[in-house]
């Protein structure tokens, strides 16, 4: 569409919307409310309706515009990158008497955005230190059935037709050796998983292996029983970890080469018969020599990757995969927050202190009653994108930023956090109705009489009339990536938060509409009792509060109200922290989190925690 036609179309739409009430109107048509720009300036275009062009003037942020004959206007104004949230207020006044006829206001974000449905790349980090790997070793152990009896079933022939006795070169006594009852057994086995550079070592120790053999003689060779035992058996293997190609929210684990199997303390003991006959002494060593490689080969075959780089895995690799599936954050956290959270892995990095799972992240809202869905209140915004901040993916060490040991770390970038806030606002976050007010002496019911103490024009309303202040976000709160003004872990900015003062009656009567922008510090802490990341809003300076009066049916004097509201709101707005939904952290591997520290690891907001048994 040509620019002129597009402008005329907007004006036509505006006129149609205004028909029926014939009220004067001003509308900012471009850019869209909540849009993003990296330019130093922004061009504001708009139009008026139901007003005499020759008798009105329009100012945007108190800068005069030139009205075209068709009622349209355009003006270029600065975009403040430091503020991020940039409001633009269009005010139409009648020239003849100076009366304000109409207002419109939008916010433009200085910066880039992540479009709805797109991923924030490299935006979530999940760290599992070696101490955390120690915590999941029992889970891996429980998933592997190390059955020596299956490796050497009863009846397996170990030695066949061995010539035990010979006379003048002729064999006069032969022996077969077969696995006997009771079946081969072990007393226990242990697993030690240890992260190394670019791989994870998975070392198994098998204790008290016992194998009973029947030595079956023929000719002059006797028959007897032999018990072989090994104090311990070491089975050492290395494993490579990477995102699963078919479903990258999970970890794919593959054995590197074959496991190395070695015995310590192999012993022999006759259990029956005459096998201490001197002529067959060498037989014992032969059996021991043949049984060891058979057991070694059996264990290697059992524990090796059956098809190399193919889809099948070794038992230990498969068990590690299954255990690590317990740290997928996509489903559990998303459902708890009533959002659709996708976090496919882009890497699994192993180092000598632990392993780090890095994810791209997408958080969206979905209307419905299913898992991860919500039923937003009427009037909730449907936002085109969220504020994005370029940040480097963090590294992790053996200790937290504060130098404390920990088992697990969970970090999220500013961009991913803002996606989460966007999705939650679309689902109703920060919607509230206030029916009480605290002026420093305790909560009081909100009535026309109490509000008249602040806004004298409410004295014209019956003082007993109950009032309600309806708070409605039009945009998502956003984190800028900076620290808060009071040293808090983050800085949060909220744009165009609407407060409508209405009569709380069957048929509401609107008295006042105020748009509020503010800047504050965001605190974060972990509640180990509820297993949630909790948020708080720090103190707010009046200078960090911007207000605009968009509706004034009570006909209050706007100048004094605009001067007084920032101070009043700076005292009330920190309570908004209670409206920020806590971030539920799921259990991992059946273990609960015990908070160690919440801090910025690099740029990421990171929870460091230990894994402890649940109640």
Q: Which residues are covered by each model-predicted region?
A:
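Outer-membrane beta-barrel proteins
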Residues: 32-36, 78, 225, 347, ...
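Bacterial N-terminal signal peptides that target proteins for export
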Residues: 1-11
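Beta-strand secondary-structure signal
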Residues: 43-45, 74-76, 87-91, 201-205, ...
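Amphipathic hydrophobic-ligand
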Residues: 217-238, 508-521
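C-terminal motif of bacterial Sec signal peptides marking the signal peptidase cleavage site
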Residues: 18-20
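Extended, low-charge, aliphatic-rich alpha-helical segments
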Residues: 111-212, 271-615
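Ser/Thr-rich low-complexity repeats and stalk/linker segments
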Residues: 24-34, 39-110
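Well-ordered mid-protein domain cores that form the structural environment of catalytic cofactors
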Residues: 226-242, 246-276, 280
């Amino acid at each position: 569409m040509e620019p002129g036609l597009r402008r005329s179309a907007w004006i036509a739409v505006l006129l149609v919307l205004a028909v029926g009430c014939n009220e004067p109107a001003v509308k900012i048509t471009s850019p869209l409310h909540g849009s993003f720009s990296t330019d130093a300036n922004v061009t504001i275009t708009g139009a008026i309706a139901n007003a005499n062009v020759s008798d009105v003037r329009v100012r945007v942020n108190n800068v005069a515009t030139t009205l075209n004959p068709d009622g349209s206007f355009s003006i270029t104004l600065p975009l403040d990158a430091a503020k991020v949230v940039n409001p633009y207020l269009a005010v139409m006044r009648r020239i003849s008497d100076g009366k304000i006829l109409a207002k419109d206001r939008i916010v433009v974000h200085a910066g880039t955005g992540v479009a709805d449905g797109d991923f924030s790349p490299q935006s979530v980090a999940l760290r599992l230190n070696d101490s955390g790997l120690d915590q999941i070793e029992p889970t891996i152990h429980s998933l592997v059935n190390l059955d020596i009896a299956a490796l050497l079933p009863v009846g397996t022939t170990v030695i066949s037709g061995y010539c035990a006795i010979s006379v003048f070169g002729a064999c006069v006594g032969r022996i077969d050796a077969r696995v006997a009852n009771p079946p081969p057994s072990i007393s226990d086995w242990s697993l030690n998983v240890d992260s190394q550079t670019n791989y994870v070592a998975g070392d198994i120790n098998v204790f008290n292996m016992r194998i009973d053999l029947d030595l079956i003689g023929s000719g002059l060779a006797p028959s007897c029983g032999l018990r072989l035992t090994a104090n311990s058996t070491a089975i050492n293997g290395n494993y490579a970890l990477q995102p699963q190609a078919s479903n990258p929210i999970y970890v794919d684990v593959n054995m590197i080469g074959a496991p190395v199997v070695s015995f310590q303390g192999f012993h022999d003991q006759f259990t029956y018969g005459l096998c201490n006959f001197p002529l067959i002494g060498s037989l014992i060593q032969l059996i021991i020599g043949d049984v060891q490689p058979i057991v070694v080969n059996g264990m290697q075959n059992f524990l090796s990757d059956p098809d190399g780089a193919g889809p099948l895995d070794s038992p230990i690799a498969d068990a590690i995969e299954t255990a690590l599936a317990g740290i997928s954050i996509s489903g559990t956290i998303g459902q708890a927050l009533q959002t659709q959270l996708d976090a496919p892995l882009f890497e699994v990095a192993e180092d000598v202190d632990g392993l780090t799972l890095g994810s791209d992240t997408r958080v969206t809202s979905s209307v419905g009653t299913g898992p991860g869905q919500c039923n937003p209140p009427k009037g909730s915004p449907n936002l085109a994108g969220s504020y994005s901040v370029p940040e480097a993916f963090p590294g992790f060490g053996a200790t937290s930023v504060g130098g404390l040991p920990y088992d697990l770390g969970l970090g999220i970038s500013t961009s991913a956090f803002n996606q989460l806030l966007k999705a939650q606002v679309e689902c109703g976050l920060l919607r509230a109705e206030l029916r009480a007010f605290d002026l420093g002496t305790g909560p009081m019911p909100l009535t026309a009489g109490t509000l008249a103490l602040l806004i004298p024009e409410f004295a014209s309303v019956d003082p007993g009339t109950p009032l309600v202040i309806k708070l409605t976000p039009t945009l998502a709160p956003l984190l800028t990536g900076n620290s808060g003004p009071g040293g808090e872990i983050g800085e949060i900015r909220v744009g165009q938060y609407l407060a409508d003062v209405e009569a709380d009656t069957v048929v509401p009567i609107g008295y006042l509409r105020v748009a509020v922008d503010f800047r504050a510090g965001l605190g974060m802490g972990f509640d180990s009792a509820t297993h949630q990341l909790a948020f708080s809003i720090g103190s707010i300076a009046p200078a960090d509060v911007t207000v605009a009066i968009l509706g004034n049916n009570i006909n209050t004097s706007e100048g004094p109200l605009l001067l007084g509201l920032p101070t009043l709101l700076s005292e009330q707005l920190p309570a908004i922290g209670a409206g920020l939904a806590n971030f539920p952290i799921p259990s991992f591997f059946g273990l609960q989190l015990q908070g160690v520290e919440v801090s910025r690891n690099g740029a990421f907001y990171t929870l460091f925690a230990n894994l402890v048994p649940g109640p």
